[in-house]
From Swiss-Prot:
One Gene Ontology cellular component: mitochondrial inner membrane
Chief location: mitochondrion
Pfam families, sorted: MPC
Membrane topology, from the record: Multi-pass membrane protein
Transmembrane annotation, as ranges: 19-35, 51-67, 74-90
Annotated protein name in UniProt: Mitochondrial pyruvate carrier 2
Entry annotated with the keyword Transmembrane helix: yes
Keywords, ordered alphabetically: Membrane, Mitochondrion, Mitochondrion inner membrane, Transmembrane, Transmembrane helix, Transport
Compartments (UniProt record): Mitochondrion inner membrane
Top-level lineage group: Eukaryota
Amino acid sequence: MATSKLQALWNHPAGPKTIHFWAPTFKWGISIANIADFQKPPENISYLQQIAVTCTGMIWCRCSTIITPKNWNLFSVNVAMAATGIYQLTRKIKYDYVSEAEAAVEIEG
């Protein structure tokens, strides 16, 4: 049973014998690096980098469901990229704008 499933994965059009498997697998490194950056201070976050990560994730999520063969590894890595990019952008926006607004209110008050 396990052998037949493993063989089916190996021979799949988006399996390990193709670029359709390895490209998204290595792309997970970007999402993992973005997750590791959750611990870094928000002032070090780059708007342009996170916008690129977010847009790439969103665009390729759609494309990964249209292409043949369907590549769910590509879809999942791009969902992760979009999610981590949105989270990082949220952290940066809160740091740049919300904390400044709170500081201004405290100064006035």
